[in-house]
Amino acid sequence: MPFRRTLLAASLVLLITGQAPLYAAPPLSMDNGTNALTVQNSNAWVEVSASALQHNIRTLQAELAGKSRLCAVLKADAYGHGIGLVMPSIIAQGVPCVAVASNEEARVVRASGFTGQLVRVRAASLSELEDALQYDMEELVGSAEFARQADAIAARHGKTLRIHLAFNSSGMSRNGVEMATWSGRGEALQITDQKHLELVALMTHFAVEDKDDVRKGLAAFNEQTDWLIKHARLDRSKLTLHAANSFATLEVPEARLDMVRTGGALFGDTVPGRTEYKRAMQFKSRVAAVHSYPAGNTVGYDRTFTLARDSRLANITVGYSDGYRRVFTNKGHVLINGHRVPVVGKVSMNTLMVDVTDFPDVKGGNEVVLFGKQAGGEITQAEMEEINGALLADLYTVWGSSNPKILVD
C-alpha cells in the first residue's frame, strides 16, 4: 500500500504540473537547536557549543589577518553539527563564503538568510547542478565534457554559471584536471572558453596532511595556475586561488593564497597542540538502569566478556545504530558523574553496558558522556581515533546525522 500511495502521488504531480517530481536527499533540519525538548526524551544526543564555534571562527580570522578570505566548509551537515545550528554563528561572525556538498545543504544555507558566496566543493551530477541554479551556487568543474554539459544547462535557463576550475595538483585524482599532461592542459583551456560559464576561481585539494607533501602540491598548483592564466589570457585580479584545508591553513601559511577552505578547525578538530581551538561537539546518552551480576557471568552477544567479580553494570541507551560503533566493544570508555568506566561486552544495536562496580553513586538517569568532557574527565579525540582506526570525522559526522542536536551556549 505505501508504494501504491507513493506512485499515485507521483502520478498526480505529473498530471497537474506536467513534470516528474524531483526526488532529492532527505530534508535537513532548520532547527536552531534551542529547544531542549529535542533531546530531553531522546536516548542519545549531540551538544553543539555556539560559543566554541564563534571563538574558533574569530581565532581563525585573526590568524588569517585579513590576508586571505575564510570559506567555512559545512559539508556533511556542518560535519554533523547541523547547518541550522551553525549558520547563525557563521552570519554573526561575518564569514563571507560557505562551502557545501549537497543541494539540500545549499537550501538550508540560503534559508538561514546567508546572502554571501556559496560554493560546492565536489563534482555535482548534472541534475544536481541544474536544480542548484535556484541557490546561486558556484560549481566545481574538473573536465571539459562536464563544462560543456554545464554550459548547455546554463544556456537553457538563460543564466551564466560561476565556476571554480579544479586542478589535480597534489594527486587526489578525484575532481580535478590533470595539468601534468598536455591533454589535461588542453582540457583546462577548453573549460575557460565556455560562453555561459564564468571562471571565478582556480582550486586544488591536498591529499595528505603532511607539510612537505602540501608544499609539493602547492608548488605544482602555483606553476599550473600561472600557465593557465598566461595561455588562456585570464585576468588574475578577477580570480580567487584557493587550496588550503584546515591542516594546510594552520600548518603551511604559504598555502593560504586568496582564500582558505576550513571545516574541521571551525569545530575544534585540529592537529595536536592547537589548543587555542575549542571542541564544539559532545556526544551524550543516559543510564537506563544499573544491574548486579555475579562473577562468572558473561556480558552481551557472543560472550566476549566474562565478569571476574560480582559486578554492577550500567545499561546505556545507545548503540551502533546511533553511531557508537561495535569497534568500541571491550575497548571504549565513557564518563558517568566524572568517573571513567569501561565498556564491557559487545556494543549492541541500541545498548551498551559499562562496569560501574567501583562507583556506587551511579544510578539510572545519570548523564553519560561518550565523547567530550565531564567533571574533570575527558574522552579524547586521540583515544577515539586509535580504537576506531580512522579520523574522528568518521565518527562525529555519523553522530550528528543519527541523533538530535542542541545548542548548549
Swiss-Prot record:
Chief place of localization: periplasm
PROSITE patterns per the UniProt record, alphabetical: ALANINE_RACEMASE (PS00395)
Active-site positions on this chain: 75, 301
Location(s) in or outside the cell: Periplasm
Regulation of this protein's activity per its record: Activity is enhanced by Co(2+), Mn(2+) and Sr(2+), and decreased by Cu(2+).
One Pfam family from the record: Ala_racemase_N
Source organism, top-level taxon: Bacteria
CDD domains per UniProt: PLPDE_III_AR2 (cd06826)
GO cellular component: cytosol; periplasmic space
Cysteines engaged in disulfide bonds, as pairs: 71-97
Co-factor(s): pyridoxal 5'-phosphate
pH dependence, record text: Optimum pH is 9.0.
Biophysicochemical property: temperature dependence: Optimum temperature is 37 degrees Celsius.
Catalytically driven reaction(s): an L-alpha-amino acid = a D-alpha-amino acid; L-lysine = D-lysine; L-arginine = D-arginine; L-alanine = D-alanine
Residues with the N6-(pyridoxal phosphate)lysine modification: 75
EC number of the protein: 5.1.1.10
Residues engaged in binding substrate: 174, 349
GO MF annotations in UniProt: alanine racemase activity; arginine racemase activity; lysine racemase activity; pyridoxal phosphate binding
Miscellaneous comment as given in the Swiss-Prot or TrEMBL entry: The active-site cleft is located at the dimeric interface and contains the two conserved catalytic residues, a lysine from one subunit and a tyrosine from the other subunit.
Function as written in the Swiss-Prot or TrEMBL entry: Amino-acid racemase that catalyzes the interconversion of L-lysine and D-lysine, and L-arginine and D-arginine. To a lesser extent, is also able to interconvert alanine and isoleucine enantiomers.
NCBIfam families, A to Z: alr, PRK13340.1-4
Family that this chain belongs to: Belongs to the alanine racemase family. Bsr subfamily.
Subunit composition and interactions: Monomer. Forms a head-to-tail homodimer in the structure.
Protein name (Swiss-Prot/TrEMBL): Broad specificity amino-acid racemase
Natural source organism: Pseudomonas putida (Arthrobacter siderocapsulatus)
Gene: bar
